[in-house]
Amino acid sequence: MSFSYPDTEWDWETIDPSDIHFPRDFAWGTATAAHQVEGNNDNNNWHLWEYSKDENNLSRIHNSDKSGLAADHWNRYSDDIKLMKDLGVDHYRFSVEWSRIEPQLGVYDSTALQHYKELCQELLDNNITPVVTLHHFTHPIWFEKLGAFEKEENSKYFVAFSKIIFEELKGLVPIWSTFNEPSVFVAQGYFNGIFPPGKKDPILAGTVMENMLNAHVQIYHKLKSLPGGDTIKIGIVKNIFQFDPYRRWNLLDWAFSKFLNDVYTNSPLKFLKDGQSSFYLPGMVDNDMSNPKAVRSLDFIGLNYYSRMHVKGHLNSREPFTFANREQDVMTDMGYPVYAEGLYRALKTISILGVPIYVTENGLADDTDEIRPTFIKRYLYALNRALRDRIDVRGYFYWSLMDNFEWAEGYKMKFGLYDVDFETQKRVLREGSMPFIEMVNKQGADKRGYLVDIGDMAPDFTIRYTSGKEERLHDLRGEVVVLQFTASWCSVCRIEMPHLEKDIWEKYKDKGVRLIGVDRDEPLETVLQFQKDVGTTYPLALDPGADIFGLFADKNSGVTRNVVIDRDGKIVFLTRLFEEKEYQDMLASIASLL
């Protein structure tokens, strides 16, 4: 790493963040956590923490706030689902409160289980997909008293709980996260001491991190082995906060930035990717982690991203580094800068795992609501840029649906798309939330009529050939696929098709390239006569209702277009009409894939 290594910052004066497009099947959602919104969660580790004092006999929570009734989401979830509908989102990420479900060891509350079943069913009834987090910073008091994840043997209790909740919600929840942000849980609870259990013990922090990651692996394989386990996606949610040198010329700043990035981000990612890693900070902790089963313990990875921090190194053993803000940065109420470029960086970092990515949290605290519109536009632009660069992102969840109890910050931080008056529980949509709503509901065609974009995963469908043979597009993974949308009444198609025959079909048909013509809105006999008239031999498929066409483009748009899909199922090139330069560029794109 060099002192001249460029800082990733974009010139926003030259960028139009509204000029973006997301795939039609992209998941849009909001997120909450049980303790922050449900209310009356008084049997978990955070309840104890809120009512305790620090070493100076001061409240551990800003303004001595208590979660208390919170946003009363437990009783008001039906109304909150209506708010989600108003936003236009189709996914909702929330956590189940372990302490409600298993208030005593081995004793399960049927009423609590039924509540979560009814919540999931009501979401589905409103065409909103439930996304469940099993552990979002809280667990029962009895588990805390046993030592929680400080002891390896305690993981069996969390695995047992996970099995129970899976069996209860099976068939209702297709996407599951085991843990929310283990790195934050460890950093705040065992390094900084501002989350429960309030310890400052780097060695114990390494143990807890290892035990949580191993518990994730156990839960993944356990749930996958159960009936119905093969139908769900299971992942873990990883927070990334980049640590960048405050002074790019300073060796200490670089060194401590690297150490922090390694222990906070790279170590757990390497464990999940390779099954082994090291939790290491010089002079503080050096814990080797190994579990071969971790290598295949993810169907997806969740990314929570907010910002970055600048690190200043010091020649001081008591305080070897501190965090500093730059004067030019626009700051959120949480004290970190607006840094959309970091979302792009984080997506590239986490893509090393080779699994689909969901941005499971992204948002800001902004009491004035003045920064929120710019924040949303820029971060969604960064997300779209990652998609264009072929990073496999499947969805985005804004944090949060509504204002909530923000852990050690209490009720001071206003993250919600909806403002909450905690005296009356009235929810009011913030004006600054509009860019998010507009993007969620924007997903129509682009200027050329396409509903998909380069970098998207190609929508799957059944190909029905004129020969009567059928196969699914997904089954063609491993080959380059060129879809040519056509129709007998399309004069441009008739001109283009002989060129496709010569330049693609005859040249590459035995080299791993599938050229498939998709004829829209016409019966078999018309399609067969059409193929005979133009003199082509590459296979044609039937699309009588233009349903396949409608997966890729607005049905009211022109038919002449080609879609090039790589061996992994990603769209890499799109054409419209038959323009010579674009056509040659398409041929070059196909050749580059071979």
Language-model-detected regions and their locations in the chain:
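N-proximal helix/coil linker or "cap" segments that precede and/or mark the start of modular domains
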Residues: 445-460, 477, 529
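Thiol/disulfide oxidoreductase modules built on the thioredoxin-like
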Residues: 532-537, 543-591
